[in-house]
Amino acid sequence: MLRRTRCTQAASVLINYVRRGEGKPLLLVHGLGSSWRSWQTIMEPLAAKRAVVAIDLPGFGKSPPLAGEVSLKTLSDAVTQFLHQHDLAGTDAVGSSMGARLVLELARRGGVVGSVVSLDPRGFWAGWERHVFHTSFWLWVRMVRALQFAMPLVATQARLRALLLAPFSARPDALAPSLVLEEMRGYATAPWFDGVLSDLVRASPPQGIAPGSLTKPLVIGWGRLDRLCFPRQAVRAQQAFPDARLHWFERCGPFPHWDAPEETARLILETTAD
């Protein structure tokens, strides 16, 4: 469903979202190039306990792009306005990849979200690590765009799927072909992918917060096998958010909710429990 809200730019913005389950609200924020469907691997166990609100960030999925500047800041502003518009300010939040960085920013602002689980947040690179992420991701997306004609076949063939998803999943065989196909279409067609990727890699390191500033639990989760943002970046993330707890996902790439869905769902529910 689409609901109209307002961005701090005073520009009208539409944010597509789905709501599943009942109970205490839980916000899910996907990563760069993706959509709410990225969370399908853990949607069912979360919705059994919580009222899950999974959004498409502006310019991704079924949400139109923002008018004017598109950056990490304006995306954060748009999510903030969405939460206020729907009486969800202070709700618990989970983010993946770029979405993980956004929920860290919302936690830093104070009063926007409650408990937070940030899964492999982007932006804690140093020196050449930034270029590795940018070049690897940029080249991979070009390949995905070029292979769209063959993607239905690639998504259903285990060996081809494993080759395609090597940078992103340690267990591509466990992913549903329908999810893979939807994700690859999203990467190929998102109108603001290139611009947001450039802003992400050019942006200053994420602002942290002083010790003792958090009033709600914050967990930073990281896959030991993340080859886009190396595990040592998790230490920098925790240094920026010293009150956070660091959770390691063994045998996982950059998307723990893909490679370890049961562990990820359990971590989210435990962290955001009353």
Residue ranges of model-derived segments:
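Alpha/beta-hydrolase fold catalytic core
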Residues: 1-28, 47-51, 76-89, 114, ...
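Short glycine-enriched nucleophile-adjacent loop
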Residues: 100-111, 116
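Conserved alpha/beta-hydrolase catalytic His-Asp/Glu region
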Residues: 151-212
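Flexible "cap/lid" loop of the alpha/beta hydrolase fold
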Residues: 108, 116-148
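Active-site loop/oxyanion-hole signature of alpha/beta-hydrolase fold enzymes
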Residues: 40, 44, 53-98, 266
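Catalytic histidine-centered segment of alpha/beta-hydrolase-like enzymes
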Residues: 252-265
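Conserved HGGG/HGGXW glycine-rich cap/lid loop of the alpha/beta-hydrolase fold
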Residues: 18-64
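Conserved serine/cysteine hydrolase catalytic core
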Residues: 189-236, 248
